[in-house]
UniProtKB/Swiss-Prot annotation:
It is an enzyme of class 2 (transferase). Catalyzes the transfer of a ribosyl phosphate group from 5-phosphoribose 1-diphosphate to orotate, leading to the formation of orotidine monophosphate (OMP). GO terms for biological process: 'de novo' UMP biosynthetic process; pyrimidine nucleobase biosynthetic process. This is Orotate phosphoribosyltransferase. It comes from Oceanobacillus iheyensis (strain DSM 14371 / CIP 107618 / JCM 11309 / KCTC 3954 / HTE831). It comes from the Bacteria. Belongs to the purine/pyrimidine phosphoribosyltransferase family. PyrE subfamily. It catalyses: orotidine 5'-phosphate + diphosphate = orotate + 5-phospho-alpha-D-ribose 1-diphosphate. The keyword Transferase applies.
Length: 202
């Protein structure tokens, strides 16, 4: 399933690599890899496979959540599809509380006393996912884990989740992407080394 989703993300252009002209991330960082999992919304087969992969991860981890929480904004749709398949309640978490109305950071029914799985589309440093999980904890939730579609596999993110004492897992990521591209002959050993050097620099 993971290998299939890696291939599908490449096929629809959700993950792209360009070693000649680097992409510019929101942070301003120049990168040879760009991930936009929002594209998966437009591909029913891909998004269904992603939801099924999340269910498989839950089964493998032995987790039984009461609630599925989506991280705003790209994690919301995947949390909705997953919660629908599981027949579970869903909430979503903003990066910060609203500046109007009730000033909610978490939208949906109360999560107090509930066991919650957090869904994120992408983990880079892990910062935004951890902040969402902490907001849920402050609201009285017990966090099972953060699940994402793709991870860059940075040491920085591993350390951050460890320090926050929050489990995390991802369907696919940087290492699986390289394996897929090497296997299909689309990436040379030299290009692979350039990508690995880039990741180590972060």
């Amino acid at each position: 399933m993971n290998k299939q989703i890696t291939k599908e993300l490449l096929e629809i252009g959700a993950v792209q690599i360009n070693l000649d002209t680097y992409f510019t991330w929101t942070s301003g960082l120049k990168s040879p890899i760009y991930c936009d999992n929002r594209l998966t919304m437009s591909y029913p087969k891909v998004r269904k496979n992603i939801a099924r992969a999340f269910i498989l991860m839950l089964e493998q981890d032995g987790f039984k959540p009461d609630v599925i929480a989506g991280c705003a904004t790209a994690g919301i749709s995947h949390a909705a599809w997953l919660s629908d398949l599981l027949g579970l309640p869903m909430v979503y978490v903003r990066s910060k509380p609203k500046g109007h109305g009730k000033g909610n950071q978490i939208e949906g029914a109360s999560v107090e006393g509930k066991t919650v799985l957090v869904i994120e589309d992408l983990i880079s440093t892990g910062g935004s996912s951890i902040e969402a999980a902490k907001a849920l904890q402050q609201a009285g939730a017990n966090i099972l884990a953060v699940y994402s579609i793709f991870t860059y596999g940075l040491d920085k993110s591993k350390d951050a989740f460890l320090q926050a004492n929050i489990a995390y897992n991802s369907i696919t990521g940087f290492d699986e992407l390289i394996q897929e591209l090497i296997g299909s002959g689309e990436l040379s050993e030299e290009e692979k080394n350039e990508l690995l050097t880039f990741r180590e620099s972060l």
